[in-house]
C-alpha cells in the first residue's frame, strides 16, 4: 500500500554542462514545485538533478500511478523540531554553501506525514534549496554604495568617475571594507561579461543603466547647471541600485569578474560599450535579428507553467509602463506646482511691501514666507516621487525585459534541440537508403554520423531540461524580490506623503493667528 512504497530513485547523478553554475543559488530559491507522486515514506527523498515535470517539452518520463489515498504533506504541520532532527538529514546537502553570514533559527516547523485520506489533497515537495533558504534566510552580509561623482578630463574626452565602496564580512573578499574608482563604461563592461556567462543558461542578470548621449554630452561640454547635476545624481543612484541587485544574486556574487570589479584598483578598459560605434550598431542589428527569429520560431509549448508566466510578464510589463508614464507626469506637475507656488510667494511678498495697512501687510508677508516653505515641500515631494517610485518602475521595466530574455534563450535552446532531432532523422533515412542501395563503404560513415547526432540530441535535451529548471528557480527568486522591493518602496513613499501633509498643516496652523489678527 502507500505506506509500504519505496522512495523514488535518486537518479544516476550524471552531471550536466550547467551544474557548475548552480553553486550558491540555493539560498534564494523560493519556487515550490508540485509533485506528481509523493510516497509516504518517513524519509523525504531529493529529486534527481535533471528531473523534469510532466509538462516539459520533449520526451515524456515514465508516469507513476498513485493510489487514491494521497496525503497532504502540510495537513498537520504543527510540530516544531530541531534542525538536528534526523528527518532533515537526507534533504540537507553536504556540499559547501556560499560564504555568507546566515541567520539560523533555533527551531523549524516540519510537516508530519500521516496516512490520512483527503478529498482534495495538495501535495508539495520541499526541496533541499527551500529547506536551506528557510533555515539560513535571504541575508548576504554585503553593502555597496556609489558616491562622489567626479568629472575627469575636459571636452568630449571627459568622463564621470564614481567611488564604489563595499563593506562585507564575506570570506571571499580579501578585506572587510574597500573602495575603488569606476567609470560608467566599467559598469557596462561588467554587465556584458555577466550576461555572456549566465543569460543563455537561464539566469536573470540585472540590467545596467542605459546610456544617455544627450545627458552626458551636456555634462562634458556644458557648465555645471541644475540639469547636469540632476543627471549625474540620477545616474549615480541607478548605478548603486544596479550593483546592489547584482550582489543579491547568489550565483553572480561568486563570479570572479564581479569580485575583480569591486576589489581591483585598476581594471582593463571596457571595450565595445559605446552607443555610437561599430559594436553598438552590431548589437542593434543582432537585437533586430533576434526579434525576427522569435517571430519565426513556433515552439510547441506543453508546459503550462511557462506559458502562464510568459503571459503574466507580458501583462505586467504593459501595466508597469503605463504606471511609469503616469508617475513621470505626476513628477512634472509637482515641479510645475512648486514653480507656481514660488511665483505666488514672490507676488505676495511684493504686495505686502506695498500695503499701507500694517496688520494686512504683516499677514501678506507671513503668507509669502509660508508659501516659500510650501514650495520647498513640493520640491522635496517631487524628488520623492521620482527617486522612490518612478525609478523603481523604470528598474523593473528593464528587469522584466531581462526575464523575457531568459525565456527567449529557452526557446533558442529548444530550437537547437529540435534541429538536432531533425538532422538525426535525416541521417537515419540516409543510412537506410545506403543499406538498400548496398553501399557498405558509406554505411560505417553514416553510422558514425548517427552516433554523433544522437549525442547532440541527448545533450540538447539535457540543456533544455536544465535551462527550464534554472528559469523556474530564477523566476521564483525574482518574484520574491519584486514583492519585497515594492512593499519597501510603497511604505517609504506613503510615509513621505504623510510627512509632507503634516508639515503643511503645521505651516497653515502657524499662519492662522496672523490672518485672524488683521483688524
From Swiss-Prot:
PANTHER family: SORTING NEXIN (PTHR10555), SORTING NEXIN-2 (PTHR10555:SF31). This is Sorting nexin-2. InterPro entries: AH/BAR_dom_sf (IPR027267), PX_dom (IPR001683), PX_dom_sf (IPR036871), SNX2_PX (IPR037918), Sorting_nexin_N (IPR005329), Vps5_C (IPR015404). Pfam families: PX, Sorting_nexin, Vps5. The keyword Transport applies. GO terms for molecular function: cadherin binding; epidermal growth factor receptor binding; identical protein binding; insulin receptor binding; leptin receptor binding; phosphatidylinositol binding; protein heterodimerization activity; protein homodimerization activity. The BAR domain is able to sense membrane curvature upon dimerization. Membrane remodeling seems to implicate insertion of a N-terminal amphipathic helix (AH) in the membrane. The keyword Plastid does not apply. CDD domains: PX_SNX2. Belongs to the sorting nexin family. Predominantly forms heterodimers with BAR domain-containing sorting nexins SNX5, SNX6 and SNX32; can self-associate to form homodimers. The heterodimers are proposed to self-assemble into helical arrays on the membrane to stabilize and expand local membrane curvature underlying endosomal tubule formation. It is a peripheral membrane protein. The modification Phosphoserine is found at residues 97, 117, 119, 185, 277. Residues 278-295 are annotated as: Membrane-binding amphipathic helix. Keywords: Acetylation, Cell projection, Endosome, Lipid-binding, Membrane, Phosphoprotein, Protein transport, Transport. The lineage of its organism: Eukaryota, Metazoa, Chordata, Craniata, Vertebrata. SUPFAM superfamilies: BAR/IMD domain-like, PX domain. A 1,2-diacyl-sn-glycero-3-phospho-(1D-myo-inositol-3-phosphate) binds at residues 183, 185, 211, 235. Residues 260-519 are annotated as: Interaction with RhoG. Residues 27-50, 93-104 have a biased composition (Low complexity). Residues 1-104 are annotated as: Disordered. Residues 299-519 form the BAR domain. It is found in: Early endosome membrane; Cell projection, Lamellipodium.
Amino acid at each position: 500500500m502507500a505506506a509500504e512504497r519505496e522512495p523514488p530513485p535518486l537518479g544516476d547523478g550524471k552531471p550536466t554542462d550547467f551544474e557548475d553554475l548552480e553553486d550558491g543559488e540555493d539560498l534564494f530559491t523560493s519556487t515550490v514545485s508540485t509533485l506528481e507522486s509523493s510516497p509516504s515514506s518517513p524519509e523525504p527523498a531529493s529529486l534527481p538533478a535533471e528531473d523534469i515535470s510532466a509538462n516539459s517539452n520533449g520526451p515524456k518520463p515514465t508516469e507513476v500511478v498513485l493510489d487514491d489515498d494521497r496525503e497532504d504533506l502540510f495537513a498537520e504541520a504543527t510540530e516544531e523540531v530541531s534542525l538536528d532532527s534526523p528527518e532533515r538529514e537526507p534533504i540537507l546537502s553536504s556540499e559547501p554553501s556560499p560564504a555568507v553570514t546566515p541567520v539560523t533559527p533555533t527551531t523549524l516547523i516540519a510537516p508530519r506525514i500521516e496516512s490520512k485520506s483527503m478529498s482534495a489533497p495538495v501535495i508539495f515537495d520541499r526541496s533541499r534549496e527551500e529547506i536551506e533558504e528557510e533555515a539560513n534566510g535571504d541575508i548576504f552580509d554585503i553593502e555597496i554604495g556609489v558616491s562622489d561623482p567626479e568629472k575627469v578630463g575636459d571636452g568630449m574626452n571627459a568622463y564621470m568617475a564614481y567611488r564604489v565602496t563595499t563593506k562585507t564580512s564575506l570570506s571571499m573578499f580579501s578585506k572587510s571594507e574597500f573602495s575603488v574608482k569606476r567609470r560608467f563604461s566599467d559598469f557596462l563592461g561588467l554587465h556584458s561579461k555577466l550576461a555572456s556567462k549566465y543569460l543563455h543558461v537561464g539566469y536573470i542578470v540585472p540590467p545596467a543603466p542605459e546610456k544617455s548621449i544627450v545627458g552626458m554630452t551636456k555634462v562634458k561640454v556644458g557648465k555645471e547647471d541644475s540639469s547636469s547635476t540632476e543627471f549625474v545624481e540620477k545616474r549615480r543612484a541607478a548605478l548603486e541600485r544596479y550593483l546592489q541587485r547584482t550582489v543579491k544574486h547568489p550565483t553572480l556574487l561568486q563570479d570572479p569578474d564581479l569580485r575583480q570589479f569591486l576589489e581591483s584598483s585598476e581594471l582593463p578598459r571596457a571595450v565595445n560599450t559605446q552607443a555610437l560605434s561599430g559594436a553598438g550598431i552590431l548589437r542593434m542589428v543582432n537585437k533586430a535579428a533576434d526579434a525576427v527569429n522569435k517571430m519565426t520560431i513556433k515552439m510547441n509549448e506543453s508546459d503550462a507553467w511557462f506559458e502562464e508566466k510568459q503571459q503574466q510578464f507580458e501583462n505586467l510589463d504593459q501595466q508597469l509602463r503605463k504606471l511609469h508614464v503616469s508617475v513621470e507626469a505626476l513628477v512634472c506637475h509637482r515641479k510645475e506646482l512648486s514653480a507656481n507656488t514660488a511665483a505666488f510667494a514672490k507676488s505676495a511678498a511684493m504686495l505686502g511691501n506695498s500695503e499701507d495697512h500694517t496688520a494686512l501687510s504683516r499677514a501678506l508677508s507671513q503668507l509669502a514666507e509660508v508659501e516659500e516653505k510650501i514650495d520647498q515641500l513640493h520640491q522635496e515631494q517631487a524628488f520623492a516621487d521620482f527617486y522612490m517610485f518612478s525609478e523603481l518602475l523604470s528598474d523593473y521595466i528593464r528587469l522584466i525585459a531581462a526575464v523575457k530574455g531568459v525565456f527567449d534563450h529557452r526557446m533558442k535552446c529548444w530550437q537547437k534541440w529540435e534541429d538536432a532531432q531533425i538532422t538525426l532523422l535525416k541521417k537515419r533515412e540516409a543510412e537506410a537508403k545506403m543499406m538498400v542501395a548496398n553501399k557498405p563503404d558509406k554505411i560505417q560513415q553514416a553510422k558514425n554520423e548517427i552516433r554523433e547526432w544522437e549525442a547532440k540530441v541527448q545533450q540538447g535535451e539535457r540543456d533544455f531540461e536544465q535551462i527550464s529548471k534554472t528559469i523556474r528557480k530564477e523566476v521564483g527568486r525574482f518574484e520574491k524580490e519584486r514583492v519585497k522591493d515594492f512593499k519597501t518602496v510603497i511604505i517609504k513613499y506613503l510615509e513621505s506623503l504623510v510627512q509632507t501633509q503634516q508639515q503643511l498643516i503645521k505651516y497653515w496652523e502657524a499662519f492662522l493667528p496672523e490672518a485672524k489678527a488683521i483688524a
